[in-house]
């Protein structure tokens, strides 16, 4: 933990659009095997700390529905519900593993112990402020 690794040439690379399921079972990439799928923090290419930046987009190809995410946080955790198997939800609905996807705006894991990460320490008298926008729509 604490390494900011490049995504190029790995199943973690979503810089060009492709389906989440296309590479999720590429267990030659050890991190996908350990997490049973995606459960990783992505470092955003931000222009300036605290600025609102484009973070992620997810599109359902048949209907064209999309979710776009913008945030002031330095990272986004991508989680593909790898451990949901048999989870019971509203009105008895059951959810198998990988039946959902989450985009979570956040600081990097283990930030307080990594001096080279943006600080998340909140000292007395200071405020924590962040903005995350989830935009929903339909592409034609």
Set out the residue ranges of the language-model regions.
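An exposed, glycine/acidic-rich loop-and-rim segment of catalytic or binding clefts
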Residues: 1-140
